[in-house]
């Protein structure tokens, strides 16, 4: 059986919290920011939690997290 490996792209994007929930960054805030309102950009700050329907697939990509 081959080695289990972590998907490095997922490891760079997600962090597992102590409670088991997974933290992710917000999308839509890297570029083309001039046409976005100040309110919209402010609301995109910080991080968010991965939805419960996606937690299993994210954990499968990071078997050691």
From Swiss-Prot:
Annotated Gene3D superfamilies: 4.10.410.60
Molecular function GO terms recorded: structural constituent of ribosome
GO terms of biological process kind: translation
Positions with biased composition (Basic residues): 1-15
Chloroplast found in the keyword field: no
GO cellular component: cytosolic large ribosomal subunit
Domain of life: Bacteria
PANTHER family: 54S RIBOSOMAL PROTEIN BL35M, LARGE RIBOSOMAL SUBUNIT PROTEIN BL35M
Similarity comment text for this entry: Belongs to the bacterial ribosomal protein bL35 family.
UniProt-recorded name of the protein: Large ribosomal subunit protein bL35
Gene name in the database record: rpmI
């Amino acid at each position: 059986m081959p080695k289990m490996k972590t998907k490095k792209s997922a490891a760079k994007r997600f962090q597992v919290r102590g409670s088991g929930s997974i933290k992710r960054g917000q999308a839509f805030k890297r570029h083309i920011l001039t046409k976005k309102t100040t309110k919209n950009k402010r609301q995109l700050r910080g991080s968010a939690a991965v939805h419960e329907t996606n937690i299993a697939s994210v954990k499968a990509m990071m078997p050691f997290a």
